[in-house]
Amino acid sequence: MMHLPDRLALARSIRSSTVAPLPGRYRLPVAAVLPVGYLRLLLPSHRYQPGLPARTLPLYGYTAAADLDGQVVVAASRSDDFAPWMGPRPTRSRLEQEVDRLQREQPRSRVVAQLSVCALEHNCLTAQNTFFGRGEGALPTSAACNADCLGCISLQTDSGTPASQPRMGRAPSAADLIAVASQHLNRAQAAGEPGMVSFGQGCEGEPLLRERELLEVATELRRQFGSATIHINTNGSRPQALRRLFEAGVNSCRISVFSFQQELFAAYYRPRGYSIEDVMASCRTAVASHAQLTINLLTFPGVTDAPDQVDLTVSCLRELQVRQLQWRSLNVDPLWLLERLPHLEKGVGLERLMEKVRVSLPGLAMGNFTRPLAGSALP
């Protein structure tokens, strides 16, 4: 649970349906932060407190919470239970040992240096996987980006709140990336896993901006590990670069989308030199290249479930032949974000959106985690 400072908790009157601040000096607005594998359905009901400066909240997925017979309940839905992500993790001491091991093996690696911070200080599970040689391994690639997303977790330019996973300062070489990926895939496959590594992590910019280096990495990894899943998380801004990466050996991609509508897309991403049409083209490129295509839908109650957004999202998912849809709660100060987006019609509710997607697209897998291509079927 988290306190929302400088804000008032709101409540709706049962009799009049009016909304007003809760009376009482000690009535504080709070929100829940959900564990992985759960999707936020409602925002906490609150507003700015008059007369106080509106400090921007840190980057969390603030979720409505309530008291029900003395128990805290939250407005959330289970979105995934993929065992490799939901099971028990190795101990902290084991993690520290593995980090120390890889630092000694690759003392000058920028990738190892970045992942060490992510694993130990930010508790990034994908970074930790890379040291344990299990599951999806992280390959942070780019220090630059061609967007200035309102909810960017690696670089905040104007919100006044710190990034939750500060961006890597210097981009690694192709040799660095190959060395880290190879040790991860060797260990994973020796343990009987299909092996998976991913470009594009929360602590970096846009990996497609490093096309030349990634082409070299993908080519070498595909030569060494014929059955591995080589995945990229991307904003989909450069479809031709993505096509060349598929030709080099990348066989899976996850493209993040806040909205398929250009006005809302541009308001959130603040892109430099690309549009939603380029993102759509990247999706089509993935399908044409026979790569696994996943859409990472950044959801925000009252926006994602606006009636026109619901219809457009379902239509685009159908047209693009998406294999998996990942429901992702957008981590951002709710009031701060809404002040920067176009006004939308009242939302129908995320549960109704999810049900419409299930009914309209029965073959579409839905979840929260990307699956490796070999040895793991989508739900």
Task: List each language-model region with its residue ranges.
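Short, charged low-complexity linear segments at domain edges
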Residues: 111-135
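Alpha-helix-loop-beta-strand connector modules within alpha/beta enzyme cores
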Residues: 211-227, 276-293, 344-368
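Active-site-proximal loop/turn and secondary-structure-junction residues that shape catalytic pockets
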Residues: 203, 234-238, 259-261, 299-301, ...
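Core AdoMet radical
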Residues: 136, 140, 156-180, 184-217, ...
